[in-house]
């Protein structure tokens, strides 16, 4: 009975203990994404800004923004028309981590994102734009490495895949930094 109460108390305190041990993390990443619409693909600059809360040493939740911001991918549609495409994505999901060494950790994350995709047909006169939005899945895998400059600062590298609306997909590679609070 006492062992059961002790274990229950330990599990109840663990999220609070983890939160007080620098388990609030912020990240900023930059890289490139390959946007593909099934007819053509193009690479474009992408950025990610996010927040993670760890409810255990190896599991956490992610919230953030990922998108092409002002950059546009130059693609072709099914009729051969030149189109320019960009997207904004607000995501939420789960993160799982596995330490490899004292200084390096591998991680995987996944969840769902509300995505807004904008297509502009630049072959048309005048140009026509359409916007498509919806909730779509994403998955990512990456590594983070301690910097040695600051115990709360880490460098990251990540590969992500995200389904977008209207048959589009995004495959990204990014590098960045994470800061623990």
List each model region and its residues.
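Repeated loop/turn-to-beta-strand initiation elements of outer-membrane beta-barrel proteins
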Residues: 24-28, 57-63, 102-106, 147-157
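Transmembrane beta-strands of outer-membrane beta-barrel pores
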Residues: 30-36, 45, 65-71, 98, ...
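Outer-membrane beta-barrel translocator domains and adjoining extracellular loop/strand segments
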Residues: 37-45, 71-80, 118-127, 167-173
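Short glycine/proline- and aromatic-enriched beta-strand/turn motifs that initiate or cap beta-hairpins
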Residues: 15-61, 65-74, 96
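Outer-membrane beta-barrel "beta-signal"
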Residues: 25, 141, 145-147, 154, ...
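Cleavable N-terminal export/targeting peptides
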Residues: 1-23
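Residues that define the transmembrane beta-barrel architecture of outer-membrane proteins
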Residues: 22-24, 43-47, 86-90, 133-139, ...
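Membrane-embedded beta-strands of outer-membrane beta-barrel proteins
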Residues: 28, 49, 92-94, 110, ...
């Amino acid at each position: 009975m006492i062992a059961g109460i002790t274990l229950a108390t330990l599990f109840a305190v663990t999220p609070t203990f983890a939160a007080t041990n620098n388990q609030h993390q912020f990240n900023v990443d930059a890289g490139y994404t390959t946007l593909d619409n099934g007819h053509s693909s193009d690479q474009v600059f992408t950025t990610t800004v996010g927040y993670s809360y760890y409810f255990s040493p190896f599991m956490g939740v992610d919230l953030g923004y990922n998108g092409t911001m002002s950059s546009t991918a130059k693609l072709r549609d099914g009729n051969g028309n030149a189109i320019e495409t960009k997207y904004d994505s607000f995501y939420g999901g789960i993160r799982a981590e596995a330490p490899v060494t004292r200084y390096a950790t591998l991680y995987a994350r996944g969840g769902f994102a509300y995505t807004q995709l904008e297509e502009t047909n630049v072959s048309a006169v005048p140009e026509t734009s359409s916007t498509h939005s919806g909730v779509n899945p994403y998955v990512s895998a990456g590594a983070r490495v301690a910097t040695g400059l600051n115990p709360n600062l880490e460098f990251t590298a990540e590969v992500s895949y995200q389904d977008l609306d209207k048959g589009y997909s995004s495959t990204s590679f990014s590098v960045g930094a994470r800061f623990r609070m």
